[in-house]
Amino acid sequence: MKVLHAAAEVYPLVKTGGLADVLGALPEALIGAGADVRLVLPGLPAILAGVEQQQVVHEIGAVFGAGRVTLRLGRLAHNGVPAYVIDAPYLYQRPGNPYLAPDGGEWPDNLQRFGLLGWVAAHLAAGELDPGWTPDVLHAHDWHAAMACAYAACHPATRAATVYTIHNLAYQGLFDEDDFHLLGLPSRLMVPVGLEFHGQLSFMKAGLKYAHRITTVSPTYAHEIATEAFGCGLDGVIRARGADVSGILNGVDGAVWNPASDPLIAAPYSADMLDGKALCKAALQRELGLAVDAGAPVFAVVSRLTSQKGLDLLLDALPALLNFPAAGGPQLAVQGNGDPALEAAFTAAAAAHPGRVAVRLVYDEALAHRIMAGADAMLVPSRFEPCGLTQLYALRYGTVPVVRHVGGLADTVVGASEASVQADRATGFMFGPATPAALAQALLQAVAAHGQPALWHRLMLRGMAQNFSWTAAASQYMALYRETQQAMQATGKL
């Protein structure tokens, strides 16, 4: 089976969130399951530099306002997965964030930049740009690639099944409806039952309306987005798709996230030999300027600093941690950036509590590994969370997660209760309402458990024993691909 993945990011070349981690690991797992997999990616500077053995496949010419568009085929340098790169310097040769200009606003031509990504993916699926390789399945990821589903649906030569994965429904790719003509799609699509969304053009709806099957990155999130509370205004569209929507949990790339072999941490360790984790903790405390105190539980945040991630709740719950005496009292390490108000508030907390609170307003992959290994507990208090990878990494590193019961967090963490602890099922701590009081209660529960070494040790080991592999996810995707193909063959359309 030939599968083409269309996406805007791939780890380690371009990463703004978990989408990149998925594209960095899932294709390899699918190849391991027997699929013939290729990616199609925008020719951002880091992607052009990170794809080796490039050969020109097709000179596309001037489309989407770009003076020159060339389709190249090479292999990702880090894992050898084949990847098409859309070389369009006018649209993609820009520094920094793939979506945002240096002033923090969206690039004004993002419609053309990601419309081109979808257009190329669909024309590859139609066998037009590389006649030597035509996919059986076109798998588009998030709004950046969603328009591929609309282009494929309108192309008479398309025989590929289309699958669309929602990594985060909140980011929808909304544009001025007057710019619809720039996409070159039939005008009949720009209606409320098509791509129109409250007077705007929605890339997200291209995937929701025109993909044969829709997936999200956890079973619970698949149910949540069909409700008004989590549907971001699209719950009706999602409910209308019914059984076409399913959830498949993300996995963990064991080659990247493994404390036994991680070259980025102070000392290796495993469930059988945990001594290295204490060394990682002391090293992290020294690096961040926290008091070096083996008995002090270190709570950590590795996240975008946004209200979606519930970090305003953490600020309001912080006194619950800091009211303990400094000696042996809880510490907090925060890494990430985002909302300027949250950045300022966490910076102020660090200034007010030296040795107890440390903040690094940057995303640094190596530092994220050191925090994951050195912290005792990882905080993920999200208001909504499609899957969440942070808690999966934390479990693997014996860093006990404290999470809200929502989305993929609910699917991957077993909250500590009397029953779950006695049954040796507990892997973390969980709270329900999105309130500072509920989070504070979970934090205090974690502090109390940390004071019971035998209990904490059991939580760590149970978490490290969890198996969230990409092999399992790949098996589910392969089954979905086959089922979608069979449905197409049986009906001619879905």
Curated annotation (Swiss-Prot):
EC number: 2.4.1.21
InterPro entries found in the cross-reference section: GS/SS, Starch_synth_cat_dom
Catalysed reaction equations from the record: [(1->4)-alpha-D-glucosyl](n) + ADP-alpha-D-glucose = [(1->4)-alpha-D-glucosyl](n+1) + ADP + H(+)
Biological processes per GO annotation: glycogen biosynthetic process
GO MF, one annotated term: alpha-1,4-glucan glucosyltransferase (UDP-glucose donor) activity
Main EC class the enzyme belongs to: transferase
Positions annotated to bind ADP-alpha-D-glucose: 15
Pfam families in alphabetical order: Glyco_trans_1_4, Glyco_transf_5
Gene3D superfamilies membership: Glycogen Phosphorylase B
Function: Synthesizes alpha-1,4-glucan chains using ADP-glucose.
Family the UniProt entry places it in: Belongs to the glycosyltransferase 1 family. Bacterial/plant glycogen synthase subfamily.
Entry protein name: Glycogen synthase
Organism listed in the record: Polaromonas naphthalenivorans (strain CJ2)
Species lineage: Bacteria, Pseudomonadati, Pseudomonadota, Betaproteobacteria, Burkholderiales
